[in-house]
Regions:
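Iron-associated oxidoreductase/ferritin-like identity signal
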Residues: 1-128
Length: 128
């Protein structure tokens, strides 16, 4: 939600609206994951990552894209873990979230005039 409120300038109005939609979707993702954690008999707890912001709209979009890339890698790993545990329905719910996260990634890369990042390199770096 923070990113959608700090972007200024006509060229960023479309992405600012999209970022506000992303924020609402992110809340739904958190609720879905919390329900799944509760289903597993655990207590959901979250320590949010600090939000990086900048006076420069382009930098703000870059920070958000970097966060989306990391989130995608994390969800891909959660899907593999769920499947390894035989929690196939849970993996499917996370896949649905992943589709939206990839849409967010596309929106941000497009706003930056870039190709969608290849997060497989991030995943490989985390395994080392």
């Amino acid at each position: 939600m923070v990113y959608s409120q700090v972007l200024k300038g006509a060229e960023y109005m479309n992405i600012a609206d999209q970022l506000e939609q992303h924020a609402h979707q992110e809340l739904q993702h958190a609720l879905t994951i919390s329900r799944q954690i509760d289903y597993l008999g655990k207590m959901p707890s979250v320590t949010p990552k600090p939000v990086k912001v900048s006076e420069k709209a382009r930098d703000t979009l870059r920070f958000d894209l970097d966060n989306e890339n990391e989130t995608i890698v994390n969800y891909q790993e959660r899907i593999r873990q769920c499947e390894a545990l035989g929690e196939f329905a849970m993996a499917e719910q996370i896949r649905e979230i992943l589709v939206q996260e990839q849409d967010h990634q596309i929106d941000l890369a497009t706003a930056l005039g870039e190709d969608v990042p290849d997060v497989s390199r991030l995943r490989g770096a985390r395994k080392r």
